[in-house]
């Protein structure tokens, strides 16, 4: 051993110290990867940045010093970097004779909850067909305040989501704007009448550009990419997955625009409050492939 150490200009003590250090780093890597796997069981599509933010308390409690770049390297070594591909089916039918409303939110920047709701509808594959998820989100807190999962594209789905949002919102004298695309569901008599009854100002996109309703579009990108709401063999399984995903989206998933706080905390006025809102930021849909079976415990 002394001859071997001498070849590298090391003392026996230095060699043992280096070996112990490598063993410690390998053990820490295993701990980190185990926590990554646990978090991705809750939100399968968590990327490096959100994982890093969620793991701060965990790293501190285990006395592990790990930066975001090193975490990214560890994920890459173990094949845990997420990849995406585009996938989108048109669900907006704006070619109709129903009354359309002007865009009221082009320059609007909400300063609190209950000022602006954004709404949209998207598909989820069920069996050989599709079911449709309607959501309403508070633009300030990013909290999904209403949702409905429906087997058809009828207005019943969006109306049910609206009723849930109204029940959560309660009675208030504060002015509220509801923004959506110009699809036939949101222009229908049942939906418009309910908004008017609740004294909510109606706002709609003025073109087919999805960037005019970017916040609502982004919700579906997140739900599909990070919670893997792509396809299910039955409506019941899909509905259960949707409910679990929305609950986790509101209570567990950190948002960059909220200072990496959750929508629930922002909606309750706790912690960091939103400072930025980008109504026309471009979004895209995509798929996520994730494999985390064989973890390599390379040193951090």
Question: At which residue positions do the language-model features occur?
Answer:
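Generic alpha-helical secondary structure signal
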Residues: 3, 10-14, 31, 161, ...
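Basic, flexible linker segments flanking DNA-binding modules
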Residues: 5, 9-113, 267-271, 276
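Mobile-element integrase/transposase regions
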Residues: 65-135, 157-164, 168-169, 173-175, ...
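Mobile genetic element proteins and their domesticated derivatives, centered on retroelements
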Residues: 4-5, 15, 36, 51, ...
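RNase H-like two-metal-ion nuclease catalytic core shared by retroviral integrases
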Residues: 91-94, 180-182, 188-192, 202-224, ...
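C-terminal domain-tail junction helix/linker
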Residues: 196-200, 222-300
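A short acidic/small-residue loop/turn micro-motif
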Residues: 138-139, 149-154
């Amino acid at each position: 051993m002394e001859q071997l150490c001498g070849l590298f200009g090391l003392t026996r003590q230095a060699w043992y110290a280096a070996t112990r250090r490598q063993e410690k780093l390998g053990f820490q890597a295993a701990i980190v990867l185990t926590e990554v796997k646990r978090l991705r069981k809750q939100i399968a599509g968590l990327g490096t940045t959100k994982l890093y933010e969620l793991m701060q308390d965990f790293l501190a409690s285990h006395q592990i010093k790990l930066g975001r770049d090193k975490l990214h390297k560890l994920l890459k070594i173990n094949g845990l970097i997420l990849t995406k591909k585009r996938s989108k089916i048109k669900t907006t039918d704006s070619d109709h004779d129903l009354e359309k409303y002007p865009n009221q939110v082009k320059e609007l920047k909400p300063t609190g909850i209950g000022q602006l709701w954004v709404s949209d509808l998207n598909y989820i594959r069920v069996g050989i067909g599709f079911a449709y998820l309607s959501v309403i989100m508070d633009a300030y807190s990013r909290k999904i305040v209403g949702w409905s999962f429906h087997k058809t594209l009828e207005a019943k789905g969006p109306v049910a989501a609206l009723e849930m949002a109204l029940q959560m919102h309660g009675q208030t004298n504060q002015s509220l704007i509801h923004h959506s695309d110009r699809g036939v569901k949101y222009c229908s008599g049942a939906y418009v009448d309910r908004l008017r009854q609740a004294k909510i100002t109606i706002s709609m996109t003025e073109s087919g550009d999805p960037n005019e309703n970017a916040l609502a579009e982004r919700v579906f990108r997140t739900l599909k990419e990070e919670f893997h709401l792509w396809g299910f063999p039955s409506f019941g399984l899909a509905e259960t997955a949707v409910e679990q995903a929305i609950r986790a989206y509101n209570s567990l998933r950190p948002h960059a625009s909220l200072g990496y706080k959750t929508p629930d905390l922002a909606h309750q006025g706790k912690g960091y409050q939103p400072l930025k809102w980008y109504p026309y930021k471009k979004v895209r849909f995509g798929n996520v492939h994730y494999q985390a079976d064989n973890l390599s415990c390379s040193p951090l």
